[in-house]
């Protein structure tokens, strides 16, 4: 008799995606981050659901409702900090996942890659709106500064900003709609993740060599399920160490001050995972130019398949490209650090140089290095 998991309409889908899925035999731990992102998303939805039960999306009570969650709700403090630090873990996994895709040429699967970029944008939008909800000083001023960037769009900019605000400033209407969107977006992300997986399973996974692994596949279960469980345990360990020992390490002290439209904080900055993009935005003195550079810094990922000039997809056997890739990583870390510093000398010039380097590496140096490697290999 055939096993029920292979015949039942619903179990068959699960079976083909997580049990009998043919996977390359040589994929490394860099391929763990997809499942870790799934775990992060589930964790964020669950903790967020419990937070939403006690949170009130009103300017007069939002801040005190978060305080109430931490002080009066049973284990409210751990739920709140798991949600806040869970977002940081989510972005660490996201950046690793995207970095793996760039290094090993996973952008060859264009549908999967493009949906991945849309997922990145959706996650960034969700995290931004979530940061506004506690209604602290940094929440309010972060929302004011970032939404105001849309006013740089010619003709419709000002109207667009006021439409998003629901008034003439960030106020009750803004907070209510941000809460509504912050609640619905993770479910949209989950649906997009399903489509992401659907396209991935059409082509099969990439592997470190970048060569087709059709001749050498192994079942996903038990080999990669056990590997993913190890990754999940390490992720939860890291998250709980952060939550239980240093929950405010990645937060901003200004967000423990209730929002005050009459008092601007000395240094407005977003959460650490947006600092690289914020540094690029700040590097350009022109408002519209800065906004375009900010959007392009992420949107440039969609161009990766078009910028690929090498005859090999993976960087595994391409030392020059490897070197440039790690310079790019160092450049992004520099941008992240600069974005968190005040707008003064020498941080302005460091940010500008790092921003130029970022676009130069992706658009010019890496394609040139790939062509050079082709010539060295006489291809």
From Swiss-Prot:
Positions annotated to bind heme b b562: 83, 182
Similarity annotation: Belongs to the cytochrome b family.
Entry binding sites for a ubiquinone: 201
UniProt-recorded name of the protein: Cytochrome b
Membrane topology, as annotated: Multi-pass membrane protein
Cited Pfam families: Cytochrom_B_C, Cytochrome_B
Binding site for heme b b566: 97, 196
UniProt-listed Gene3D superfamilies: Cytochrome Bc1 Complex, Chain C
Biological process annotations from GO: mitochondrial electron transport, ubiquinol to cytochrome c
Membrane-spanning intervals of the chain: 33-53, 77-98, 113-133, 178-198, 226-246, 288-308, 320-340, 347-367
PROSITE patterns: CYTB_CTER, CYTB_NTER
Principal subcellular localisation of the protein: mitochondrion
Cofactor: heme b
Superkingdom of source: Eukaryota
GO CC terms in record: mitochondrial inner membrane; respiratory chain complex III
Quaternary structure and partners: The cytochrome bc1 complex contains 11 subunits: 3 respiratory subunits (MT-CYB, CYC1 and UQCRFS1), 2 core proteins (UQCRC1 and UQCRC2) and 6 low-molecular weight proteins (UQCRH/QCR6, UQCRB/QCR7, UQCRQ/QCR8, UQCR10/QCR9, UQCR11/QCR10 and a cleavage product of UQCRFS1). This cytochrome bc1 complex then forms a dimer.
Cofactor note: Binds 2 heme b groups non-covalently.
A GO term, aspect molecular function: metal ion binding
Keywords: Electron transport, Heme, Iron, Membrane, Metal-binding, Mitochondrion, Mitochondrion inner membrane, Respiratory chain, Transmembrane, Transmembrane helix, Transport, Ubiquinone
Chain's role: Component of the ubiquinol-cytochrome c reductase complex (complex III or cytochrome b-c1 complex) that is part of the mitochondrial respiratory chain. The b-c1 complex mediates electron transfer from ubiquinol to cytochrome c. Contributes to the generation of a proton gradient across the mitochondrial membrane that is then used for ATP synthesis.
Annotated localization: Mitochondrion inner membrane
Additional observations: Heme 1 (or BL or b562) is low-potential and absorbs at about 562 nm, and heme 2 (or BH or b566) is high-potential and absorbs at about 566 nm.
């Amino acid at each position: 008799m055939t096993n029920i998991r292979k015949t039942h309409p619903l179990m068959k889908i699960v079976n083909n995606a997580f049990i009998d899925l043919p996977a390359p035999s040589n994929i490394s731990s860099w391929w763990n981050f997809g499942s870790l992102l799934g775990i992060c998303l589930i964790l964020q939805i669950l903790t967020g659901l419990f937070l939403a039960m006690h949170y009130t999306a009103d300017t007069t009570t939002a801040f005190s409702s978060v305080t109430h969650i931490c002080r009066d709700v049973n284990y409210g403090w751990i739920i709140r900090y798991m949600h806040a630090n869970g977002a940081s873990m989510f972005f660490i996994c996201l950046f690793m996942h995207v970095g793996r895709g760039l290094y090993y040429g996973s952008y060859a699967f264009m549908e999967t890659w493009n949906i991945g970029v849309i997922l990145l944008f959706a996650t960034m939008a969700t995290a931004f709106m979530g940061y506004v909800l506690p209604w602290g000083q940094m929440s309010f001023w972060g929302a004011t500064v970032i939404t105001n960037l849309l006013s740089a769009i010619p003709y419709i900019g000002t109207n667009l900003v006021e439409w998003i605000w629901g008034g003439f400033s960030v106020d009750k209407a803004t907070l209510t709609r941000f809460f509504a969107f912050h609640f619905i977006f993770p479910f949209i992300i989950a649906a997009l993740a399903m489509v992401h997986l659907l396209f991935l399973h059409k082509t099969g996974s990439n592997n470190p060599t970048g060569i087709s692994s059709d001749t050498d596949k192994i079942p996903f279960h038990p080999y990669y399920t056990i590997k993913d469980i190890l990754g999940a345990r390490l992720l939860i360990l890291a998250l709980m160490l952060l939550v239980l020992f240093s929950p405010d390490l990645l937060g901003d002290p200004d967000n423990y001050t209730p929002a005050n439209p009459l008092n601007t904080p000395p240094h407005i900055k977003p959460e650490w995972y947006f600092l690289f993009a914020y540094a690029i935005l700040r590097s350009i003195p022109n408002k519209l130019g800065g906004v375009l550079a900010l959007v392009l810094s992420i949107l440039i990922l969609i161009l990766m398949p078009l910028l690929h000039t090498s005859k090999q997809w993976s960087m595994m056997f391409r030392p020059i490209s490897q070197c440039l890739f790690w310079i790019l990583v160092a450049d992004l870390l520099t941008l992240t650090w600069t974005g968190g510093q005040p707008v003064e000398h020498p941080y302005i010039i460091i940010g500008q140089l790092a921003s130029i380097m970022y676009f130069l590496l992706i658009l010019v140096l890496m394609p040139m290095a790939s062509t050079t490697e082709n010539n060295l290999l006489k291809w």
